[in-house]
Amino acid sequence: MKAVVYDSAKNFTVREIPTPEPKEGEVLIKIELAGICGTDLHIHEGNFLAEFPLIPGHEMVGIISSVGKGVTDFKSGDRVTVNPVVSCGDCEFCREGSPILCHNRKGLGTNWPGSFAEYMIATQDLVFKVGNLTPEQAVFAEPAACAMHGIETLGMKPGSSALVFGAGPTGQILAQLIAKSGASHVTVAASTKFKLDVAKNLGADAIYVMDRSNVKKSFEDLKAMRPEGYDYVIEATGNMAIAEICVPLTRSGGTMMVYGVGETTDTFPINAFDVFHREITIKGSFAEIDTFPSTIAALQSGRIKTDGLISHRFKLEEYGKALETLRSDKTAHKVVITF
């Protein structure tokens, strides 16, 4: 089979390798679509827990080609997606019922072979049928599951206001889920107008076009739009200059959530007294672990919409071009690999 194989950070080729055979409890999946996201850019650089050699890719949909011994819930021909996060089940956090915080967490496409290949192996406990979802819908299962975990972490109260920084695919899905969780008003702020137009079409109450070279003005404008602040402010860009203005934009008693993926060394300043006397809560939301069933149900019901999110399609052999498009093309939204 053909696969993207990294021998080290930044050093990859698309080459022929043996097609794996499913072992007991495993399924072999023929990939139909695989999504590229910002995490893959970090992995390309050797960050985000990447271990080489590696086949990257953690967003996918495909058809089961064959199953190993002991697999009873799946058969050849089933369209499925895969939860790429694997917890050990034995560390302190797993035993406490918090596997998302697992000390020994593994990830398909991070330190296990992922989906930028014609075929991939997954253990049956990580595999989910997608029913009547199209490949173009089902490929969003993983980013949507991350957004679903973010909503659970946020713990939103109905009637609240929210500000989402970032209109990438997960920012778009977060905004939808926030609105459907009973928010009275959702504002999405981003630097790309066409992405904000998509956000508006998908249900955002207000949009704001940011100038990332003048974050101070963006802060002033967003503060003027809601002088008392926003009950929930979600940073979904990974940009530390934007993260810095989140707490000041949070309403007293409100919550700021760090959701965007930055570099492992990134920091941003916080006024401790402001957090203290206004009783601001700061939360983080990382990946997902158990939200695939609810996410697939939300995609099937139309509660999560993905219309207009896929902007670019590339063949596996064009993986390098796909990465560069996501990194530098301002018209890129969701970039997918087709097979």
Identify what each model region corresponds to.
Residues 3-21, 38-66, 81-82, 99-113:
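N-terminal glycine-rich cofactor-binding segment
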Residues 221, 244-248, 289-339:
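C-terminal hydrophobic helical "lid"/dimerization subdomain
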Residues 88-165:
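NAD(P)H dinucleotide-binding glycine-rich loop of Rossmann-like/cofactor-binding domains
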Residues 215-227:
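Short amphipathic alpha-helix with an adjacent loop that forms part of the alpha/beta core around
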Residues 133-212:
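Mid-domain Rossmann-like dinucleotide-binding core that forms the NAD(H)/NADP(H) cofactor-binding site
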Residues 200, 205, 240-303, 338-339:
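Glycine-rich phosphate-binding loop and adjacent beta-alpha segment
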Residues 18-34, 47-92, 126, 131-133:
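Glycine-rich beta-strand-centered segment in the early N-terminal region that forms part
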